[in-house]
């Protein structure tokens, strides 16, 4: 079960491919995958929203640092279903994160925090709400 907060604390290096698998609950409103050093320092926040924060079936990507969210990036398409398995792949370099969604579509998001990783990113938490 992936209800609540799952703190994976896994690290991965530039060029490595990280695969995240999960199942949103049947009544899930949204879930998030956070890559960063802590809850206050997230280089990558992937937030698929079934029905949350005024969005329906939207994938929102952002970063969070110094108590502030960055600029939200929204992507078309929503290849997630409540109660169904998903797989997301994440890889990064000094320039950007590349996120491959379950349907094979890609999101590119700038890696603004590369120096703080010293070449290594960390899955801070996976939350399903």
Curated annotation (Swiss-Prot):
PTM sites of type N-acetylserine: 1
SMART domains given in the database record: Gal-bind_lectin (SM00908), GLECT (SM00276)
Tree of life domain: Eukaryota
InterPro entries noted in UniProt: ConA-like_dom_sf (IPR013320), Galectin-like (IPR044156), Galectin_CRD (IPR001079)
MF-aspect GO terms: carbohydrate binding; galactoside binding; laminin binding
Keywords carried by this UniProt record: Acetylation, Lectin
GO cellular component: extracellular space
Domain Galectin residues, every copy: 4-129
Binding site for a beta-D-galactoside: 69-75
PROSITE patterns referenced in this protein's UniProt entry, alphabetically: GALECTIN
Pfam families membership: Gal-bind_lectin (PF00337)
Record function comment: This protein binds beta-galactoside. Its physiological function is not yet known.
The protein's name: Beta-galactoside-binding lectin
Organism: Electrophorus electricus (Electric eel)
Organism taxonomic ancestry: Eukaryota, Metazoa, Chordata, Craniata, Vertebrata
């Amino acid at each position: 079960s992936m209800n609540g907060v799952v703190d994976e604390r896994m690290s991965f290096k530039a060029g490595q491919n990280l695969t995240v698998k999960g199942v949103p609950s049947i009544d899930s409103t949204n879930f998030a995958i956070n890559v960063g050093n802590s809850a206050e320092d997230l280089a990558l926040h992937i937030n698929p929203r079934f029905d949350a924060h005024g969005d329906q079936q939207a994938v929102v990507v952002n970063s969070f640092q110094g108590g502030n969210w960055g600029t939200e990036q929204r992507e078309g398409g929503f290849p997630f279903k409540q109660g169904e398995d998903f797989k997301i792949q994440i890889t990064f370099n000094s320039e950007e994160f590349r996120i491959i969604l379950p349907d094979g579509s890609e999101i590119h998001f700038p890696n603004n925090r590369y120096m703080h990783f010293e070449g290594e990113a960390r899955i801070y938490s996976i939350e399903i709400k």
